[in-house]
Amino acid sequence: MSLDLASLLNPEQYKAASQIEGPELIIAGAGSGKTRMITYRIAYMLSKGIDQSEILALTFTNKAAKEMADRVRETVGKKLDKLTTTTFHSFGLGLLKMYIQYLGYRNDFTLYDENDNISLIKNCIVTLGYQLADYNVRTLRDFFSQYKTERIPLPEKGTAVREIYDEWLMTQKAYNVVDFDDLIILPIKIFEKKPEILERVQLRWRYIMVDEFQDTSLLQYKLVSMIAAKYRNLAVVGDDDQSIYSWRGANYQNIINFEKDFPERKEYRLERNYRSTGNILSAANALIVHNKERKDKKLWTESGEGASISIMRHPTGEEEAMWIATHIRKLMREHHYNFSDFGVLVRTNSLMNTLETTFVESQIPVRVSGGSSFFDRKEIRDMLCFLKILVNENDDNSLLRIINTPRRGIGRTTVERLRRYADEKNTTLHIALEELSAAPEFRESTRKALQDFIKMIHRWKDMVNTPDRLLDTIVQDTCYEAMVREEFPESDKAVAFKMRGIQFLSERLSTYLKEHKDATLRDYLRSVSIIGDENDDDKSMVSLMTMHASKGLEFKVVFLAGIEDHIIPSARALEEDNRNIDEERRLFYVAITRAREKLYINYSDTRRDREGKEKTTLPSRFLEEIPNTLFQNEEKTPEETLKDNISSAKAFLEMLKNKNKK
């Protein structure tokens, strides 16, 4: 197979792809065709007679590894069973399966996940005679990971934390278990202890590529540089401007380490962007140049300047969400976009609730990434089921979910008897509950539990037409918060988070009923259910995600929400050193460069904090780093606002009408 790389790639891509001997540093800017270059580089190596079994390509997700392998396979048109395209952790696991016995482990070791480790740490605390209540075990687990990976110094010997840590390490080995950190750490130890094994691995993989190199940790870099040390055919591809994972150990300084360790390297920069318009790239370039410790690069495009970047100021976070929802509808009408053309990006998960609920209530299908969907959270699903049984006595499914949630003495045997009775009488579970609540076949305690539950349902039904306090009453009557505290005995923060979610749902319900004249509780439940019913069939959905989750993705239209100081840059970054501010700036850069055609930057004068309190906010200081000439203000006349609201209302009513016909 021969490849004419020069005709398939641009000049810089060609230079990077055609060098296959010796170390190589490829700085690939956002949207610069990095994946295409990597694909053709591997294909070119195969065309030059390099055996596929000698090539190792490492990346960070299974999805990326599979995509890389699939693209190379399509390009060369043959099976590549011996080509190794994998993640760092999968590669490390493979090495341990072959060589872990040299560290005193048995080959039948078990891989522990985070929850396994948390349980093990709890056991160690108890074994040593300490009190579980004195420790936040999840926080302890995070510290242990940082100790193990040498990201922070070990605590002094003799301290309780050091004693628990040492016990945990000893117990892991005694149990013949490893965790995800060990998948990198232990292969390094094997290579250091047994140089002949390192040489065997070096002979096997003579040509190594690392994608997303800026995301590697110091230990991951150490592992790969040890393997590459003999033949020095190591190509690393990355962009220091997109290094946004320091909190999980990524160290963009590895680019500098690579330059020191491989002084004979060749270096290439991919700066031509195939994704975004000129104005979007100008904003990104103007922003990121304020980071001093970076490789000099400037993205450019031949696709023209495109539309100006829109910046919008809102009175509140709720009005920001409604404006974005309305504007998505407007752009779809005017430019024939699909829902899947839109990405809505936020800095933190806490900003998602208002946006997601607004989209759902506005009949905009939404897919949540980088955080859990508000409507998928257990406590929210529970509350919605409580509400559903009040407006629909035929909804057996919802009743089954909450009949003993929280536990009220209605056990599985009782529920099965109610279900059998409903089947025999061809009636609903609700009626079975009413008719059997005094049945002598049940114990007195069971009858009382059934009757008390029925009384609660009747009381709640009386509040359906004035539902402002309905959810508060349900929470109080069922002792729901006590159940949550039982589930999270060690975390007041988790309890507060879940109870705030219920309060937020209550506020959304009240707001919906105030804003939609003559609307009922049933209407609200329908509005939040329509999207859920259609999601499986309708793949065209707006993507709502964190900026971290957006890395590697692109959208025709991007809305950035909550672009305010203490959100981006985060409050923690503002309190700490400039290095943290630089990472926040890189995160904003990543968010901007997800946009292909249009970019909307939004901020609000006030916003609710995590406790639900309204706080005054200021626009992000990063906005001052982008030239005003690139911005246009998205102001609306009252007539335009009214027109948009009427149009959205009509669309909503039409969707409800069609839903009812089904």
Predicted regions and their residues:
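A basic/glycine-biased coupling hinge at the interface between accessory DNA-binding modules
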Residues: S2-D4, E21-E24, G29-S32, A43-Y207, ...
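N-terminal pre-P-loop "Q-motif" helix
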Residues: A6-E21, L219
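Short glycine-/polar-rich loops that comprise or flank the Walker A/P-loop
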Residues: G22, I50-E54, L80-K82, K230-N233, ...
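Helicase P-loop NTPase motor core
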Residues: I26, A30-I38, I42, I100, ...
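Conserved helicase motor core of SF1/SF2 NTP-dependent helicases
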Residues: S32, V210, Q214-H290, K297-E302, ...
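Conserved two-lobed SF2 helicase motor
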Residues: T84-T87, D179-D182, L186-P187, M383, ...
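Conserved helicase C-terminal RecA-like lobe
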Residues: M352-I364, R377, L384-T629
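Helicase C-terminal subdomain and adjacent C-terminal extension
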Residues: T606-K662
